[in-house]
């Protein structure tokens, strides 16, 4: 199945080297390359008797020393909560992230992030020490998680991360890329895995055992076991057993008949459901225009055009789209490419596709999701009427009572855009335009406050406003204001009566210099310079962002 493929060496006990996603690198002589786009996890303990398959090519003392530094820290800590850095010396982190501790300073750890290589200090109270000297307790959690897996599924399965690129040479093999996550379905003689990629179409197909590392989802650690132990621990089926289980599952869930009959049945059901919809509310066009971050959760701005001339602006999360995809694939198996005809040929898939959820979402992932979702909803609208007008699809685009969704006449939206475009001299014209989904700005990252900006700034200008801020903001109430300095983002809690001098005194300790200027932060760059108390009051009232620049 793979020419010149050799399994990794094992020690006298038959144990392979323990490796984690921190050790992932492309198969080359240079072990210094770092895969930056994947989240790494520390290893419980490292076997000194063996190394990964490709790593055996370079075993100089220097490299071995470096490997020890990376994978064998004296102390490993795990974040219990998320935290945003308040100074340039601190590190920001998300709940569940691991750090290596290099020093201890009263209430702070001096730590490094193995995923990014950044070093800094983190508050002790936000972390728990991960004790790697007690494998029994970790194994106990492994056993517990595996028991749950076996109880919930008829056949065992594993989760793995690809260590090296693998190019398929036969039709039954699966091409994989370093850093990819795989779902392991079965094995062949403990030398090959039947795997499916998570996050893209493809598979199932054969992947060499030595090209992946098995990860325990319950702990986030590489299991560190011999591959045979991992296979036995979850009763991973052989290829033949796996095929038999799949066949039995299909036989018990799909009635006999041709694809045409299945299609006719699936057409009849949705038509009955879509009969409830009003013709004037049929969806004509949909697009995903931008995304935002609110309460540490990303969401997407969806624009819909209806056949009655109205427009909708909707706030949706990625899980909403994915749940719909799962429902549609289950309700329309023929259109999903899951049925065979009498000749054994699979039906043609016409359903659009989006990748499944991932455990850790970043800004770059969300940008890619925004592009994928924009294509997904456009394809969804163009599906046959019995799908696109079904109740399932309709439910995604209805106006919800979430404080954001709204429906209005299309002419009203055009007038809003025209007014904003004519107001080029207004300080916040660019920001106001961005609150409309027709904005042409390239930066599609919005926050909840940004999308309310048009209402709050209808008569507001930093330099031109003579109206004093509302009395309620000058009291004890505080407002969170973000400021951006170089590559860092900071948050300040400011009272409504905060002065320009007080604002500078709060910012100065968090940056590298005492010589700096303040400007409003717009979506396409920096705006007006902030110099007066009234400008600061207006910023707090409108919950704007501040950009800090060295002079």
From Swiss-Prot:
Q: Does the keyword Metal-binding apply?
A: no
Record GO cellular component, one term: cellular bud tip
Q: What one GO molecular function would you report for this record?
A: protein-macromolecule adaptor activity
The PX domain, residue ranges: 278-404
| Native species | Saccharomyces cerevisiae (strain ATCC 204508 / S288c)
Q: Indicate, by first and last residue, each region the UniProt record lists as having compositional bias (Basic and acidic residues).
A: 55-73
Report which superkingdom the organism of origin falls in.
Eukaryota
Residues with N-acetylmethionine modification = 1
Q: Kindly list the positions at which Phosphoserine occurs in this protein.
A: 47, 255, 258, 458, 461
The PB1 domain sits at: 478-551
Which residue ranges does the record annotate as region Disordered?
Answer: 1-73
The family database entries (PANTHER family) matched by this protein are listed as: SH3 AND PX DOMAIN-CONTAINING PROTEIN 2A (PTHR15706:SF2), SH3 MULTIPLE DOMAIN (PTHR15706)
Name of the protein described by the UniProt record: Bud emergence protein 1
- Recite the UniProt keywords alphabetically: Acetylation, Cytoplasm, Cytoskeleton, Phosphoprotein, Repeat, SH3 domain
Described purpose of this protein according to its UniProt entry: Necessary for cell polarization during vegetative growth. May link the cytoskeleton to morphogenic determinants on the cell surface.
Location within or outside the cell:
Cytoplasm, Cytoskeleton
Q: Which CDD domains match?
A: PB1 (cd05992), PX_Bem1p (cd06890), SH3_Bem1p_1 (cd11878), SH3_Bem1p_2 (cd11879)
Q: How does it assemble?
A: Interacts with AXL2 and BUD5.
Q: Does the keyword Cytoplasm apply?
A: yes
Coarse class of the protein's main subcellular location: cytoplasm
Q: Which gene encodes it?
A: BEM1
List residues of the SH3 domain: 72-132, 155-217
InterPro entries, per database record:
Bem1/Scd2_PX (IPR035550), Bem1/Scd2_SH3_1 (IPR035548), Bem1/Scd2_SH3_2 (IPR035549), NADPH_Oxidase/PX-Domain (IPR051228), PB1-like (IPR053793), PB1_dom (IPR000270), PX_dom (IPR001683), PX_dom_sf (IPR036871)
Kindly name one Pfam family recorded for this protein: SH3_1
